[in-house]
Amino acid sequence: MRYSQLLVQAAELAKTEPERAEELLRKAESIALNAYPDDMILCARCWEDYFHNHDNAMRCLLEAECRSSNTSGFLAVAAAHLRHFHNSQLAERCYNKALEKATDSEDHLRIQNFLSEFAPAKAEIETTNNKGWSHLKND
């Protein structure tokens, strides 16, 4: 069975049969480990969205980062950190790795596209996080 099918089944069973669903997700993860970083990102999203397990989600993202070997892989992980997990520090680390791996004009175009899409999100996350801390200090 393909890992994507396992992810779908895990999502469907998350509320009714959580133990079985976790088993399926772990199988999907073991397959995704040998594939592309995007596959581990999907596993991370499943852990977060259906099981509310942030630790396993972050572990999957770290695996995706470790298995990335090119600009597009690191940018995909950076995008996941920003879009789904709202973590600008980890996104920046992946972005810097993407910069280091950039070798040609296509890589530089990917980086420019990433910046165009995610610079506003990064600023918003940092502003929200700062407001959150300010709010807590004022209470």
Regions flagged by a language model, labelled:
Residues 1, 34-35, 69, 106-109:
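Residue signature of alpha-solenoid helical repeat architecture, marking inter-repeat boundaries
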Residues 1-33, 129-139:
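N-terminal alpha-helical interaction modules that lie
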Residues 7-8, 38-43, 73-77, 93, ...:
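Alpha-solenoid helical repeat scaffolds
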Residues 11, 15-18, 36, 48-51, ...:
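Short coil/turn linking the two alpha-helices of tandem helical-hairpin repeats
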Residues 15, 26-76, 80-84:
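Alpha-helical adaptor scaffolds
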Residues 106-139:
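Terminal, low-structured helical/coil segments at or just beyond the last alpha-helical repeat
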